[in-house]
Design a protein with these regions (language model features):
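A short SAM/SAH-binding and catalytic strip from SAM-dependent methyltransferases
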Residues: 83-96
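Conserved class I S-adenosyl-L-methionine
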Residues: 1-22, 35-39, 54-57, 114-144, 185, ...
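A short glycine-rich, Lys/Arg-flanked "PGG" loop and its adjoining helix->strand segment in the class I
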Residues: 97-112
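Short alpha-helix
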Residues: 158-181
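Core SAM-dependent methyltransferase catalytic element
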Residues: 174, 194-215
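A short acidic, Gly/Pro-enriched loop at the edge of an enzyme's catalytic core
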Residues: 72-84
């Protein structure tokens, strides 16, 4: 993998945020191709994915894809999951309150909710927003500051991009509590693939941030 150090930094955050999932019922919302899940024991992870093509890859990697579609339109068993997480998928949700509300209903009492994503206010977030507005990464303002392998332009353009505070407010309004925050990719984007970064507490500096809350 050409951007392996960046991926390993994100994987460390993913593993830190999820913690020990052995014996737990876990749901990945917007599981994509299951790339992150393929790096851990994902035998107990269920998934929801809008794309049939991506979901098929995730299934081959061991994720039990239970539904194809958006979380907002999915009927889930209530009080059923020990943990529900969104790894990168909240940036494609227009209505966070609606999406997070579906997750809350499906969580067991005191169940764990995790959202990992690029914050709108981060350096990566600003870069993606500019690329979205310009319709290209070849904008003069981005010359000399881009990472070697940026996020695919079509995904930047499809993203809604929310701030961390916006997500926190939506979760608090739904009654989630006992928050924890972790972050990585503290370097500027063009340097993030030079080394694997450690996970540190907080959310105000990282280019990839994990929000952990409980029902």
């Amino acid at each position: 993998m050409e951007n392996d150090n960046l991926f390993q930094s994100e994987l460390r955050l993913f593993q830190t945020a999820l913690g020990d999932i052995a014996g737990k019922r876990v749901l990945s919302v917007g599981c994509g191709s299951g790339l992150f899940e393929s790096m851990i024991d994902c035998s107990g992870i269920e998934g929801i994915e809008p794309s049939h093509d991506m979901g098929a890859i995730a299934q081959k990697r061991g994720v039990n894809v239970i539904a194809f579609g958006a979380i907002e339109d999915t009927e889930l068993e209530e009080n059923a999951y020990d943990m529900i997480y969104l790894n990168g998928s909240s940036s494609y949700m227009e209505d966070l309150t609606r999406a997070f509300g579906v997750c809350k209903k499906a969580l067991k009492p005191n169940g764990k909710f995790v959202s990992l994503d690029v914050p709108k206010e981060s350096a990566f977030g600003f870069m993606y927003l500019l690329a979205k507005e310009a319709g290209t990464f070849d904008h003069p303002s981005l010359n000399g500051v881009m990472p070697q392998l940026p996020y695919p332009l079509e995904l930047c353009c499809a993203g809604v991009w929310h701030s961390t505070e916006e997500k926190i407010d939506a979760l608090k309004a739904l009654g989630f509590h006992d928050f924890d925050f972790y972050q990585t990719l503290l370097r500027n984007p063009m340097y993030t693939n030079e080394v694997v970064e450690d996970v540190v507490p907080g959310y105000q500096s990282g280019g990839y941030v994990a929000i952990i809350a409980h029902k």
